[in-house]
From Swiss-Prot:
Catalytic reaction(s) noted: Release of signal peptides from bacterial membrane prolipoproteins. Hydrolyzes -Xaa-Yaa-Zaa-|-(S,diacylglyceryl)Cys-, in which Xaa is hydrophobic (preferably Leu), and Yaa (Ala or Ser) and Zaa (Gly or Ala) have small, neutral side chains
Top EC class of this enzyme: hydrolase
Official protein name in the record: Lipoprotein signal peptidase
Location of this chain's protein in the cell: Cell inner membrane
UniProt-recorded Gene Ontology molecular function terms: aspartic-type endopeptidase activity
Family in the record: Belongs to the peptidase A8 family.
GO biological process, one term: proteolysis
This protein's pathway: Protein modification; lipoprotein biosynthesis (signal peptide cleavage)
Domain of life the protein comes from: Bacteria
One annotated Gene Ontology cellular component of this protein: plasma membrane
Keyword annotations from UniProtKB, A to Z: Aspartyl protease, Cell inner membrane, Cell membrane, Hydrolase, Membrane, Protease, Transmembrane, Transmembrane helix
Species of origin: Klebsiella pneumoniae (strain 342)
Length: 166
């Protein structure tokens, strides 16, 4: 017996589309309007700064000769497949988990697009305090982190009883 897509977590795939549009749109604007390394202050402690990341988070493996592009692309594809299956197997009413999965999928696909199209990930958010700068990141990274935090949060929330689920 097949399930209706609307009865599964796949109902929340619109979040993936929203993350992709916002992420890729912001990266397009940076690529069109900034020179590599250019910085524009937005607020105290927050700049727009065009950077290229050839590695993973915090530029992990950025100087590894190119193989990491395909390695991280494979990981992103694998994560997207696993989370999509989890969304299909879950109920549409499990909002927190499905939104979390969709945020992670959207972020992973945004960075995957960059890796495959450009050969690097476009980063642009530079958060700093005084002279200390956090690693430059993008909106896809933010979506992934928020999704992961929601999964952790869900683990601390009380589970509904069988009576409440009925």
């Amino acid at each position: 017996m097949s399930k209706s897509i609307c009865s599964t977590g796949l109902r929340w795939l619109w979040v993936v589309v929203a993350v992709l549009i916002i992420d890729l749109g912001s990266k397009f604007l940076i690529l069109q309007n900034f020179a590599l390394g250019e910085t524009v202050p937005l607020f105290p402690s927050l700049n727009l700064h065009y950077a290229r990341n050839y590695g993973a988070a915090f530029s992990f493996l950025a100087d590894s000769g190119g193989w990491q592009r395909w390695f991280f692309s494979g990981i992103a594809i694998g994560i997207c497949v696993v989370l999509t299956v989890l969304m299909y197997r879950s109920k549409a009413t499990q909002k927190l988990n499905n939104i979390a999965y969709a945020l992670i999928i959207g972020g992973a696909l945004g960075n995957l697009f960059d890796r495959l199209w450009h050969g690097f990930v476009v980063d642009m958010i530079d958060f700093y305090v005084g002279d200390w700068h956090f690693a430059t990141f993008n909106l896809a990274d933010s979506a992934i982190c928020i999704g992961a935090a929601l999964i952790v949060l869900e683990g601390f929330l009380p589970k509904p009883t069988a009576k409440e689920q009925a």
